[in-house]
Structure formats: C-alpha cells, structure tokens
Amino acid sequence: AGSAHWWMKDTPFKDWYHVFDTYTGSNIAFSTNMDPNASKKDLYIQESGWFDKSMVDMNLDNPYVLNYFKQWAIWWIEWSGLDGFRVDTYPYNEKDPMAEWCAAVMNEYPNFNIVGEVWTASIPQLAYWQGGNANKDGFDSHLKSVMDFPLHDALRAGLNEDWGGWGQGMVRVYDILSHDFVYHDLSNMMIFPGNH
C-alpha cells in the first residue's frame, strides 16, 4: 500500500500497518524466517519494516487486516475472473498470516495459482516457501508456486559466458537443476526470463 493512498489518512485501527517513531525499512533479511538462530529483532524488522518510504507495511498480525486481504482476494477473483496472483516480495510479510491467506484463497479456489516472488539464490531457502515442503519447523506456506530465481540467475550467467571449466557456462544450469530434489512440486516452479 502506498503511504499517499486515501485509506492511509483514516485507517480503521492504529495498527492497520506497522508504525515506527521514524522511518524503518525492512532489513531484507528474510532468511530470519527459517533460521532457528535468528534474533527476534532481526525477524521483526524483516517482517515489519517498510519496503520503501512510500510503501507502508501492512500489519497482517492484525486479524482485521488479514480478513480484509482474504475478502479483497476473493472479490478480485470473482469480479475479474483471475486465474492467479503474483505476490511480490512474498517473504517480507509475516509468514504465518500469509500462509493462512494462501490457504483461504486456495480453499475457495482449488484450481487458482498464487506465485510468490522469493528473490533468493539459495535453493533451500526458496524450497522453504513452496507449499507442501517438509520444513523442519513444520511451516507450510500453502504457496503453490515460487519464482525460480536460482535457475533464472544460472541461465543468465550460463548464456552469457564461455565454458571455461566446471561451474561455468551452461554447467551452471545443470548444477542448479541437480538440486531439484529439494522442491515439493517441480511442476509449480515458475521459470522466467526476466523480472519486472
């Protein structure tokens, strides 16, 4: 949500979005979501910090905000006949409410697709966010698809360099594909040539 949007002038609750004394951006450390050693402060700033000074961070821990997002999603799907959502910066949100949101949408529309932009080169961290994955902490995002950034990065590098030995050129792509065993559902990995 943009800070200049009309609804930000008169929110239903003071905690409709995350409020700080001064601007606090996300630390963009979404590995704190799955790291058993992460500090609570780092996780809080990751989830609650704003993406940008003009882009407030909605407080999905507020049950009214979460319910609003569920109703909003269902309305858009019904009104426009959408087949899916792309959720940018997916791991920047509170993970449990987002999992509840995904589950609610998928329960209402089992053939719908939600793809999360999980911008990481780490294959295990990417796999963590795909729904149905056997995560050690028991977390299930209910997120059907994730964007395959490791493969995207390997394709870009592999197509733009000569093979000079193992780990270079198209061998980069092979190396990434050899890790496919960590994903719950390969058919729902979104392969893409570019982002934005």
Predicted features and spans:
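Short beta-strand segments at enzyme active-site cores
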Residues: 1, 86-87
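Substrate-binding/active-site clefts of carbohydrate-active enzymes
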Residues: 1-75, 79, 100-108, 113, ...
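Active-site-proximal helices and loops of the catalytic beta/alpha 8
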Residues: 72-83, 89-192
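Glycine-rich, aromatic-lined ligand/substrate-binding cores of catalytic
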Residues: 195
